[in-house]
Amino acid sequence: MKILLIANARTGSTVLYKALSDILGLKRYGEPFNYGMRKKANTLIRKYPFPLQHNCIVKTLTRHIPEEFKSDEINFYDEWKRDFDKVILLARENLQDIYESQDFFRHIKQHWHQKYKYETPYTFRRELYKFINDSYDYIKWYSKKSHIPITWYEDLYSGDKEKIKKCIDNWEIDISVDDLYNYVNPEKRYRQFTKQTLI
């Protein structure tokens, strides 16, 4: 089985990508067209198209379009999805949470996938919020265009097994709620909140 996971940033896409890879035994291809990340980490930069193993999962973000794709008439994901058996769209309805997460990590410049607390907001960055909003609008547009339902972060990471089961049912992938829950349990979320005490 080949799965394409298209997501917005800070939506739990890495956790879901690793979960499906582990549960289904799939080869991982993580953000192959994220050129900035790959150059910084000095990792393999793939040219499109590249051969995929038969059982694999590819995680990509909506803005990651390969440099080799030049068509103005064909949407890149419309073309690429033909190489996959399943396509999952992942987004988050709370754009403020995405903004705060991205804003925090852009300031501290540490690894994205770690626990953190965002307690003191930095100066508001209008261009960052616009970028997040545009990505959100794109995935909603693409969902409507392709007839692929969006899996919402708020459902998948809710801790509610009924909501998680509905996500799995939409994917039409044979995995159990309990297996997936081990990964999407909200107690494992990256962002931590300071408990307020009443005086």
Predicted regions and their residues:
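Residue-level marker of structural boundaries
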Residues: G25, F104-I108, R189
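A structural signal for short, well-ordered beta-strand segments and their strand-loop junctions
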Residues: L5-A7, K27-G30, C56-K59, V87-A91, ...
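PAPS-dependent sulfotransferase catalytic domain
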Residues: T62-D174
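Residue-level detector of flexible, active-site-proximal loop/helix-junction positions
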Residues: F33-Y35, T62-H64, D155-Y157, V184-Y190
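Residues within well-ordered alpha-helical secondary structure of globular protein domains
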Residues: D22, K166-N170, P186
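C-terminal accessory extensions appended to soluble enzyme cores
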Residues: E172-I199
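Conserved nucleotide-sensing/catalytic segment adjacent to the nucleotide-binding pocket
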Residues: A41-Y77
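PAPS-dependent sulfotransferase catalytic core
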Residues: M1-H54, Y190
